[in-house]
């Protein structure tokens, strides 16, 4: 997060999440099961002449799915291992929100087989969990603060990039987009990065990596991320990266500018009833208007 201190300078802040009890969410009216995925794809094709089908791997609650939706993609399948993430995704998006373990070869093959029954897939996108490559995790390991079980989990996650590439190889979408931490392409981890590039090129993709600072595009976050795009040679033009909106971090959107319109809450807060309301006075700046424009917000929430 970006925060301006008392003298107007910007400081990075790391926030620890505080979780309350989970809430039950109803499924989206256009959601479908994994077995129903080919039928769902056929239904979309009957409505849209040339739909752009996308797949969101390691989807979480659906941040990337929302971006793809706004870019005119139909996200027919989203996969994640966390139940609460999939329940949230299923509430907000149509298509299949599939809870699964993408580290398993059987799961990879099942997903690829189902997608190949759906016709042409325009894009496979996602960010394989990056803890093994993270500087933060390496620092914690150095200080012996990570349990043996956590270390074992991280080593399993080290190979999730391969799950992503394996699905790309089997499904052969027109394009793919992988996001990860920058350390994956730096000293000590370059073997993984080279393997991703080599396998994608061997599968017939033109590769175009890009280091992106989200704050340059209006996101209140300082961490740089590595994006690797691949487009099918002779089928797609190379991906063109958007030009940055900001050149100086002093111009970037701050945390206050992002959420100052929201009512104050304590950690772990959950409403007791869905009809519980609290006062909302509306967005205070252009960024907040942009972030809230897809919500149906009454005078009271």
Describe the role of every protein-language-model region.
Residues 24, 28-36, 40-172, 182-186, ...:
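Core alpha/beta nucleotide-donor-binding catalytic domains of modification enzymes
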Residues 99, 182, 205-216:
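Conserved S-adenosyl-L-methionine
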Residues 187-188, 216-219:
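Flexible, glycine-rich beta-alpha linker
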Residues 221-223:
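Short, solvent-exposed loop/turn segments at the edges of secondary structure
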């Amino acid at each position: 997060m970006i925060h301006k201190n008392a003298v107007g300078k910007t400081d990075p802040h790391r926030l620890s999440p505080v979780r309350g009890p989970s809430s039950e969410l109803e499924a989206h009216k256009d959601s479908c099961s994994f077995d129903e995925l080919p039928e769902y794809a056929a239904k979309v094709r009957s409505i849209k002449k040339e739909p752009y089908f996308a797949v969101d791997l390691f989807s979480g609650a659906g941040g990337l799915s929302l971006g793809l939706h706004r870019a005119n993609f139909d996200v027919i399948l989203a996969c994640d291992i966390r139940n609460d993430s999939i329940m949230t995704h299923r509430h907000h998006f149509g298509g299949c929100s599939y809870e699964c373990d993408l580290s398993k070869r059987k799961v990879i093959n099942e997903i690829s087989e189902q997608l190949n029954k759906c016709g042409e897939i325009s894009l496979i996108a996602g960010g394989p969990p990056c803890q093994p490559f993270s500087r933060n995790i390496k620092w914690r390991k150095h200080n012996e603060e990570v349990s043996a079980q956590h270390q074992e989990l991280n080593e399993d996650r080290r190979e999730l990039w391969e799950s992503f590439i394996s699905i790309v190889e089997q499904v052969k979408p027109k394009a793919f987009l992988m996001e990860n931490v920058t350390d994956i392409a730096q000293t000590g981890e370059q073997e993984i990065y080279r393997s991703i590039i080599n396998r994608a090129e061997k599968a017939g993709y033109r590769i175009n990596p890009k280091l992106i600072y989200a704050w340059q595009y209006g996101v209140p976050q300082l961490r740089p991320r590595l994006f690797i795009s691949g487009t099918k040679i002779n089928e797609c033009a190379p991906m063109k990266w958007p030009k940055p909106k900001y050149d100086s971090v002093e111009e970037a959107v701050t945390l206050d500018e992002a959420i100052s319109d929201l009512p104050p809450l304590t950690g772990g807060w959950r409403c007791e009833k869905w009809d519980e309301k609290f006062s909302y006075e509306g967005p205070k700046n252009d960024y907040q208007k942009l972030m809230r424009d897809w919500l149906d917000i009454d005078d009271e929430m």
